[in-house]
Amino acid sequence: MAKPTRKRRVKKNIEFGVAHIHATFNNTIVMITDVHGNALAWSSAGALGFKGSRKSTPFAAQMAAEAAAKSAQEHGLKTVEVTVKGPGSGRESAIRALAAAGLEVTAIRDVTPVPHNGARPPKRRRV
C-alpha cells in the first residue's frame, strides 16, 4: 500500500508582520501573522507544557513569545507590529521577549475590548 504524501510546509519570505498577544488571566497566546492576517506562527503557554496556574505567569508568556518568534523568523520575518489584547500578567514580558528574540518592534497597540456596559461580569471571588 502506498504511503500518503504529506504536504511540505511552504517557507514564505515575509519581512514585516503583526504579533498578536492575547493575555488572559489563565493563559497567554502569541500569534504572528502577515499584514493580511494569515498566520505564520503561533505559540501559547499551555502548548509549551505549562499547566494550571503556571500558564498565567510572565515567564510562561516570555517562553511562548520566544517560541513563536523563532518559528516566524524561519519565514524571514524581521519586523513586527504588536497588538496586545486582554488583562493578563504576561503582556509586557511577551513584548520584551519578542524584541529579545531578534524581532524589531515598530509599534505597540492595545486592542483590549472594552464593553459599553454589556454582559454582567462574573461575581467577585471570596478567597
UniProtKB/Swiss-Prot annotation:
Lineage: superkingdom: Bacteria
Keyword RNA-binding: yes
Keywords assigned by UniProt, alphabetized: Ribonucleoprotein, Ribosomal protein, RNA-binding, rRNA-binding
Transmembrane segments: none
Cross-referenced PROSITE patterns: RIBOSOMAL_S11 (PS00054)
GO cellular component terms given for this protein: ribonucleoprotein complex; ribosome
Organism (species): Streptococcus pyogenes serotype M49 (strain NZ131)
Lineage: Bacteria, Bacillati, Bacillota, Bacilli, Lactobacillales
Similarity-based family: Belongs to the universal ribosomal protein uS11 family.
UniProt protein name: Small ribosomal subunit protein uS11
PANTHER family per UniProt: 40S RIBOSOMAL PROTEIN S14/30S RIBOSOMAL PROTEIN S11 (PTHR11759)
A Gene Ontology BP annotation from the UniProt entry: translation
Annotated HAMAP family: Ribosomal_uS11 (MF_01310)
Assembly and oligomerization: Part of the 30S ribosomal subunit. Interacts with proteins S7 and S18. Binds to IF-3.
Annotated InterPro entries: Ribosomal_uS11, Ribosomal_uS11_bac-type, Ribosomal_uS11_CS, Ribosomal_uS11_sf
Known function: Located on the platform of the 30S subunit, it bridges several disparate RNA helices of the 16S rRNA. Forms part of the Shine-Dalgarno cleft in the 70S ribosome.
Gene Ontology terms, MF aspect: rRNA binding; structural constituent of ribosome
